[in-house]
Amino acid sequence: MEKLEVGQLAPDFRLKNSDGVEISLKDLLHKKVVLYFYPKDNTPGCTLEAKDFSALFSEFEKKNAVVVGVSPDNSQSHQKFISQCSLNVILLCDEDKKVANLYKAYGKRMLYGKEHLGIIRSTFIINTQGVLEKCFYNVKAKGHAQKVLESL
């Protein structure tokens, strides 16, 4: 599987948030960006991961970092997910999976013992110059947010 490497310039993007407002990577680079890709809103692993990142929101802020989740869901799905789970992370819509492809976070993965094409749970730490500082691929949701925080 092809992966992005630490030291590379992070691929730029422009995606809509839960309110339908377009946000680019450049818009976020006033802080470090923790960009995490997840398969689907309101599913067990994705909910756990989003809640964990939200619970650590103030700790990420102390480290001058903003947390941004990306999935193929639409704005309405993100709004519902944010509301139901009291999330305080930014969620972006990558409905055509173009950004996931740029970050090598879309491809073959195992699901219930079978190979499927889908989002590969991945997280990237991007510095204020837009350079990848850390790349995590095929992560487990449980405990991941804490691991990312400790990597900052």
Swiss-Prot record:
It holds the Pfam family AhpC-TSA. GO terms for cellular component: cytoplasm. The keyword NAD does not apply. It catalyses: a hydroperoxide + [thioredoxin]-dithiol = an alcohol + [thioredoxin]-disulfide + H2O. One of its GO terms (biological process) is cell redox homeostasis. Gene3D superfamilies: Glutaredoxin. Residues 4-152 form the Thioredoxin domain. It comes from the Bacteria. The active site is at C46. Its EC number is 1.11.1.24. InterPro entries: AhpC/TSA, Peroxiredoxin_AhpC-typ, Peroxiredoxin_BCP/PrxQ, Thioredoxin-like_sf, Thioredoxin_domain. Keywords: Antioxidant, Disulfide bond, Oxidoreductase, Peroxidase, Redox-active center. Disulfide bonds join C46-C85. GO terms for molecular function: thioredoxin peroxidase activity. Monomer. Thiol-specific peroxidase that catalyzes the reduction of hydrogen peroxide and organic hydroperoxides to water and alcohols, respectively. Plays a role in cell protection against oxidative stress by detoxifying peroxides and as sensor of hydrogen peroxide-mediated signaling events. The active site is a conserved redox-active cysteine residue, the peroxidatic cysteine (C(P)), which makes the nucleophilic attack on the peroxide substrate. The peroxide oxidizes the C(P)-SH to cysteine sulfenic acid (C(P)-SOH), which then reacts with another cysteine residue, the resolving cysteine (C(R)), to form a disulfide bridge. The disulfide is subsequently reduced by an appropriate electron donor to complete the catalytic cycle. In this atypical 2-Cys peroxiredoxin, C(R) is present in the same subunit to form an intramolecular disulfide. Belongs to the peroxiredoxin family. BCP/PrxQ subfamily. This is Putative peroxiredoxin bcp.
